[in-house]
């Protein structure tokens, strides 16, 4: 797909995310929330069919509101006659912002590229419309793994093990997945290169091998092993060597995830009775409970790429997606559901919506505006989505 693009000088509003993982003050976080929670009104003119549908989906899940031209701050005019073109202007400030055309792809892929360009031009953030996801699909007693565009379209089945495959996790910046499969009649961890189609067993210790989570640089992997009794958190190199045990409790640990700097792992543990979130340094020098004031039975943490926030599942009479500052503190409930995973923009979350007639539905959430959208569903019960970073 080719892009012909010209950036036009204008005074535009840029909403720039912070960079420090732990140093944002409460006042700064409140300002971020207030700023990002405002829907950005934009009008779409000249688009039809699949291109229009994709543009609406992409923009609405990234903090925009599609309105009439008379109510919009931004106007996006263009067409999708064989290619997708767009001219973006700021109606309020009377400024031209962008003129671009995409060719050589499908109408949907070209629309995704245009929406990403619009999002970045207006907000200063990279768009997410051309990102990928992985998820589990259950049919009967078996489950297989799929990868798809972030909106669920163009889904491709990855595993064909005719057993239970689960817990997909992307290697950051690569088309490689770790996951757990019962292919050999035991929960073992495999690593699958999607580009070459090759896969190999990664962890096949006695007992449970699960929850593999590659580090941000892809050089190390955290995982849950029960080879010494109860399930504990371990880390090893990406080739499986230098295995180190980080936790030693009689209760079960699960769901490790990494801080963006690769120094800390957040995980769930029942060592205090109920499930709670803990932090442990990769070198094993410290461990502490993460405060989640206002939430109990906390599991399935995922650390935002900007380092500021941890999203997780709380079970308080029903599964609830919540966030908490990475240093701990008061919890913000977001939406009913489970299996949360951050988008690369640290703004959107993909999750499993509460099951409809026993069938899992994967949805997207724009955290600041609380806008949600179901992705295109694959036949079966879908769950455990993981967003490629």
List the predicted regions and their residue ranges.
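C-terminal/domain-edge helix-coil "capping" segments
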Residues: 24-38, 103-160
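Bacterial N-terminal signal peptides
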Residues: 10-18
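A structural "domain/chain start" motif
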Residues: 22-57
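Interaction modules related to DNA damage response and DNA replication/repair
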Residues: 52, 56, 60-72
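Amphipathic beta-strand/beta-sheet edge segments enriched in Tyr/Trp
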Residues: 56, 71-117
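Conserved beta-propeller blade repeats
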Residues: 121, 163-180, 200, 204-224, ...
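Beta-propeller blade-edge and WD-like acidic-aromatic loop motif
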Residues: 141-156, 176, 180-201, 220, ...
């Amino acid at each position: 797909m080719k892009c012909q693009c010209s950036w036009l000088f204008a005074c535009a509003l840029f909403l720039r995310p912070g960079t420090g993982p732990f140093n944002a003050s409460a006042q700064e976080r409140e300002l971020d929330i207030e700023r990002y929670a405002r829907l950005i009104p934009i009008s779409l003119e000249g688009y039809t069919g699949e291109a229009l549908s994709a543009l609406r989906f992409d923009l609405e899940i990234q903090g925009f509101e599609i309105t009439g031209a008379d109510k919009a701050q931004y106007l996006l005019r263009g067409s999708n006659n064989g290619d997708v073109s767009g001219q973006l202007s700021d109606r309020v400030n009377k400024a031209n912002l962008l003129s671009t055309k995409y060719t050589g792809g499908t109408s949907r892929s070209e629309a995704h590229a245009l929406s990403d360009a619009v999002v970045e031009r207006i907000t200063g953030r990279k768009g997410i419309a051309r990102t990928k996801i992985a998820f589990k699909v259950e049919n009967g007693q078996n489950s297989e793994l799929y990868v798809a565009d972030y909106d669920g379209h163009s889904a491709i089945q990855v595993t064909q093990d005719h057993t239970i495959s689960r817990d997909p996790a992307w290697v950051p910046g690569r088309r490689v997945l770790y996951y757990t499969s019962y292919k050999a009649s035991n929960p073992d961890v495999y690593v699958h290169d999607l580009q070459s189609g090759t896969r190999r067993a990664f962890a096949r210790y006695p007992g449970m091998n699960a929850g593999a989570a590659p580090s941000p640089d892809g050089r190390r992997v955290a995982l849950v092993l029960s080879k010494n009794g109860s399930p504990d958190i371990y880390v090893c190199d990406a080739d499986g060597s230098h295995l180190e045990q980080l936790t030693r409790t009689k209760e079960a640990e699960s769901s490790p995830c990494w801080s963006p700097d690769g120094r800390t792992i957040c995980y769930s543990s029942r060592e205090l009775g109920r499930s709670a979130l803990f932090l442990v340094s990769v070198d094993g020098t410290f461990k502490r409970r993460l405060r989640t004031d206002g939430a109990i039975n906390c599991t399935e943490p995922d650390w935002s790429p900007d380092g500021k926030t941890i999203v997780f599942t709380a079970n308080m009479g029903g599964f609830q997606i919540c966030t908490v500052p990475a240093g701990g503190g008061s919890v913000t409930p977001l939406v009913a559901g489970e299996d949360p995973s951050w988008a690369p923009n640290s703004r959107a979350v993909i999750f499993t919506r509460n099951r409809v007639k026993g069938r899992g539905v994967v949805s997207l959430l724009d955290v600041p505006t609380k806008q949600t959208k179901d992705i295109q569903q694959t036949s079966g019960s879908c769950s455990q989505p993981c967003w490629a970073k």
